[in-house]
């Protein structure tokens, strides 16, 4: 049948029929009878309109050939065969210019002589049965119905056949020929029996009573009735031409669509100012761990016990001193806080039984560092509403900061492999279905690529710190509890390892609302000298607290050990998300999975194994000033994971805004790359929306600079 259709009908008709079927998700190769029926219907519509014109006097005439210069207008507007968007646009335009009532369903033709829409039917059954089904479906007095059959019968509204005898005879002859051609190939019986009746289900519920009144009350402005609004919505098809849509939406909108060319976009303007500073809740690439392997001490797994054990592995402690003060803080207090921690840990060891938790003495330095009694006193509004000069604090605008190189280094480091594994493969039961087998295989491959990644260490560190802090905030609201910063991993040889990064002391934490803040002081070990990039450490006071012997190629060297101390704060909602940082693994796995799916659908088989095991293939990882960076599939996994982790570590309103707004510009640039000839209006407004998010956040500034690299290369 498919071959017959392609031989029997004009290629333009065949192409239109294929498009129509695809629009409704149907396959011409499978539903061949439907394919033939659509082609037949299209051909009848075109034959109905052929040769019929209206002359300058408004008379209907038939012209088969003749003076091409005669001022003739086609008598029929063909609606059938256009895509839905365009078809509704034509119908709306006809209704607006002629005042004809808008039909509920798309008709096939419009007759400019009789000023009416026409619904054409071609049936393999009895014409009167089909006529009644059509009439019952469209329920419109105004639309004229004209039915033809393959046996030469016809039926039309009020027996008004619109066309002259000869034109209709041409159509009937063509239908009869199609029937004979099908019969001679043995296709007719199947075609005749495959016709289904028109859907006669009422497409609209009648709304009455209270619901009707509510509907009328809740109409958008400028709509007089529900019918009026419905007709507008039915005719409003997405992805049409933008100007038309805008003018349909509002009379006030007057947008000029500007073509978006390779020369149109400019780079994003990054702010000037001092370099941006580190703002994560804990150190990332600069962190130093004191570790114990195969821990088996008494109380193993109790954080305080583990922390003391880790501290004992280090012998190079010395009298601490400040080497990089905090600009605004009382630096001696930070020094005293560290000394207090050392002293109180010593006290614990002197006790007979080590307690499971340690609450610090509320010394003046700790009260200062944790902002105790600093919050202005809350007063009931009733008591102060008569105060004449009651006003909110003036808050300063954030100072713009420029992009600094350290954030790119942080990101690069997060993509690297460490020599330990940070996640265990969960024990999941046997696979039952084949899809589970594929899912397990993908998960195992992905885990193998990211389990040793530094970003995965950050996830586990973040989960631990946030869980411990939230627990302490709820369990010891008034106490200044000491919380060790701990993580656990496995070495290459499979030995368990417990690591201590430093300590947190939390302040008072009566957290009623999700956004109520708990203050904490963090003290973290590091080998990084803060004087190398002082701008990165603006918010920290850094002490030198010891000397560490390191094994290197040239033997042992001694390096100073630093303690990075700062006051910080977080909230219940931030801690909740911090505890769920493992989701980053899932997000990046899903991104990889969509890449595998794309590959599999091209090859029409599951490509998981080939995808992960192909050593030769490289994949695009990201943009840099040098061009598109490429790497192995493992590198892609780790880069996607690092992006997801940094989105969590550096979450902020600036990032939310930048991601949402820059995505719109990205889609336009991609459309240009796909030769879709995008057009824009108010591109300046879009740039403004993106650039107002570029203030001082290191991760947002880095993403903006990547975006500029992408623009440069995408527009070459």
UniProtKB/Swiss-Prot annotation:
Q: Where does Mn(2+) 2 bind?
A: 80, 108
Q: Which UniProt keywords apply?
A: Cap snatching, Endonuclease, Eukaryotic host gene expression shutoff by virus, Eukaryotic host transcription shutoff by virus, Host cytoplasm, Host gene expression shutoff by virus, Host nucleus, Host-virus interaction, Hydrolase, Inhibition of host RNA polymerase II by virus, Manganese, Metal-binding, Nuclease, Phosphoprotein
Q: List the disulfide bonds.
A: none
Modification after translation: Phosphorylated on serines and threonines by host kinases, including human casein kinase II.
| GO annotation terms (biological process) | cap snatching; DNA-templated transcription; symbiont-mediated suppression of host gene expression; symbiont-mediated suppression of host mRNA transcription via inhibition of RNA polymerase II activity; viral RNA genome replication; viral translational frameshifting
Q: Which InterPro entries match?
A: INFV_PA, PA/PA-X, PA/PA-X_sf
Q: Does the keyword Metal-binding belong to this entry? A: yes
An example of a GO molecular function for this protein is:
metal ion binding
| Cofactor(s) demanded | Mn(2+)
Enzyme class, broadest EC rank:
hydrolase
What compartments host this protein? Host cytoplasm; Host nucleus
This protein's superkingdom? Answer: Viruses
**For binding Mn(2+) 1, which residues are annotated in this chain's numbering?**
41, 108, 119-120
- HAMAP family, per the entry: INFV_PA (MF_04063)
Quote the subunit structure annotation: Influenza RNA polymerase is composed of three subunits: PB1, PB2 and PA. Interacts (via C-terminus) with PB1 (via N-terminus).
State the family it belongs to. Answer: Belongs to the influenza viruses PA family.
What protein name does the entry list?
A: Polymerase acidic protein
Q: What is the scientific name of the source organism?
A: Influenza A virus (strain A/Guinea fowl/Hong Kong/38/2002 H5N1 genotype X0)
Organism lineage reads as: Viruses, Riboviria, Orthornavirae, Negarnaviricota, Polyploviricotina
């Amino acid at each position: 049948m498919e071959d017959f259709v392609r031989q029997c009908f004009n290629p333009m008709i065949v192409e239109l029929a294929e498009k129509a079927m695809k629009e409704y998700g149907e396959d011409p190769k499978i539903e061949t009878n439907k394919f033939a029926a659509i082609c037949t219907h299209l051909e009848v519509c075109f034959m109905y309109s052929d040769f019929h014109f209206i002359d300058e006097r408004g008379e209907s005439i038939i012209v088969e050939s003749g003076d091409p210069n005669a001022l003739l207008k086609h008598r029929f507007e063909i609606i059938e065969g256009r895509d839905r968007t365009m078809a509704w646009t034509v119908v709306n335009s006809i209704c607006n210019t002629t005042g004809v009532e808008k039909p509920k369903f798309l008709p096939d033709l419009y007759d400019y002589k009789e000023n009416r829409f026409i619904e054409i039917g071609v049936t393999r059954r009895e014409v009167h049965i089909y006529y009644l089904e059509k009439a019952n479906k469209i329920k419109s007095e105004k639309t004229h119905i004209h039915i033809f059959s393959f046996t030469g019968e016809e039926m039309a509204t009020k027996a008004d056949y619109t066309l002259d005898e000869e034109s209709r005879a041409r159509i009937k002859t063509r239908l009869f020929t199609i029937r004979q051609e099908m019969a001679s190939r043995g296709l007719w019986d199947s075609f005749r029996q495959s016709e289904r009746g028109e859907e006669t289900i009422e497409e609209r519920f009648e709304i009455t009573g209270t619901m009707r009144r509510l509907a009328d009350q809740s109409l958008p402005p400028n709509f007089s009735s529900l019918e009026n609004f419905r007709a507008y919505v039915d005719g409003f098809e997405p992805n049409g031409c933008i100007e038309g849509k805008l003018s349909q939406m509002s009379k006030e909108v007057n947008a000029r669509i500007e073509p978006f060319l390779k020369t149109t976009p400019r780079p994003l303007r990054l702010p000037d100012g001092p370099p941006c500073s580190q703002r994560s809740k804990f150190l990332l690439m600069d962190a130093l761990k004191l570790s114990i392997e195969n821990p088996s001490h008494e109380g193993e797994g109790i954080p305080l016990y583990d922390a003391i054990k880790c501290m004992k592995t280090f012998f190079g402690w010395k009298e601490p001193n400040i080497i990089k003060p905090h600009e605004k803080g009382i630096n001696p207090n930070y020094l005293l806080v560290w000394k207090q921690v050392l002293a109180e840990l010593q006290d614990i060891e002197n006790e007979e039984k080590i307690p499971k938790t340690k609450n610090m003495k509320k010394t003046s330095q700790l009260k200062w560092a944790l902002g105790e009694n600093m919050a202005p006193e809350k007063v009931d509004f009733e008591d102060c509403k008569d105060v004449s000069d009651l006003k909110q604090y003036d808050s300063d605008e954030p100072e713009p900061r420029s992009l600094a190189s350290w954030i790119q280094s942080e990101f690069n480091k997060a993509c690297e492999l460490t020599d330990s594994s940070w996640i265990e493969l969960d024990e999941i039961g046997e696979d039952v279905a084949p899809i589970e087998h594929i899912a397990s295989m993908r998960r195992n491959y992905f885990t193998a690529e990211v389990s040793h990644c530094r970003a995965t260490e950050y996830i586990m560190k973040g989960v631990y710190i946030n869980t411990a802090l939230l627990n302490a905030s709820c369990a010891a609201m008034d106490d200044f509890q000491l919380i060790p910063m701990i993580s656990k991993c496995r070495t290459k040889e499979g030995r368990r390892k417990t690591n201590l990064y430093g300590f947190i002391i939390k302040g008072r934490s009566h957290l009623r609302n999700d956004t109520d803040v708990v203050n904490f002081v963090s003290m973290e070990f590091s080998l990084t000298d803060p004087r190398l990039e002082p701008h990165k450490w603006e918010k920290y006071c850094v002490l030198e607290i010891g000397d560490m012997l390191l094994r290197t190629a040239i033997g042992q060297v001694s390096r100073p050990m630093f303690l990075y101390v700062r006051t910080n704060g977080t909230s219940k909602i931030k801690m909740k998300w911090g505890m769920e940082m493992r989701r980053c693994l899932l997000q990046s796995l899903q991104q990889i999975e969509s890449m595998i799916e794309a590959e599999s659908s091209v090859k029409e088989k599951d490509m998981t194994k080939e995808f992960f095991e192909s050593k030769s293939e490289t994949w695009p990882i990201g943009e840099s000033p040098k061009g598109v960076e490429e790497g192995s599939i493992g590198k892609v996994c780790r880069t996607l994971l690092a992006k997801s982790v940094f989105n969590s570590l550096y979450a902020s309103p600036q990032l939310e805004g930048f991601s949402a707004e820059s995505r719109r510009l990205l889609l336009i640039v991609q459309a240009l790359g796909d030769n879709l000839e995008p057009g824009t209006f108010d591109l300046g407004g879009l740039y403004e929306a993106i650039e107002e998010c570029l203030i001082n956040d290191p991760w947002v500034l880095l993403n903006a600079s990547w975006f500029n690299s992408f623009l440069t290369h995408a527009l070459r």
